[in-house]
A protein has these predicted regions:
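Conserved catalytic or regulatory cores that recognize and/or transform ribose-phosphate-containing ligands
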Residues: 1-114
Length: 114
């Protein structure tokens, strides 16, 4: 199985948003992508309230993004950190889209019955 890495760009926030992010990741997985969500991963071991750990999380997120082929924006509200991710993706030629955009692309790629 060879899946395209899809970076999930989402606001760092409250833990109640994590259920929504898990749902986004599941949908990407179901569409054939390998979802990578630093917000979910790093919240398990980094304390976003500590400036050094927050900055390390940002740096690690950007490093992960550089290895991905697609950036998926999973929020209507784009934070400053998300904007930086989108700009880096653009600079590196990484496709940036939304979950709806990924769904549309995936549906168009499916073979059509005649």
């Amino acid at each position: 199985m060879n899946r395209t890495f899809a970076y999930v760009s989402a606001p760092n926030g409250e833990s109640h948003a994590h259920a929504k992010l898990r749902n986004y990741c599941r949908q990407l997985y179901d569409l054939g992508y390998l979802p990578i969500c630093p917000t979910l991963m790093f919240s398990r071991f980094l304390d976003g309230e500590l400036p050094e750990e927050r900055e390390n999380g940002r740096a690690m997120s950007m490093d992960i993004l550089r290895r991905c082929r697609v950036l998926v924006v999973c929020s209507n509200d784009v934070t400053e950190d998300m904007e930086k991710e989108i700009l880096l993706a653009k600079r590196l030629g990484i496709v940036a889209t939304t979950l709806a955009g990924i769904r549309k692309i995936s549906l168009q790629a499916e073979p059509r019955e005649e």
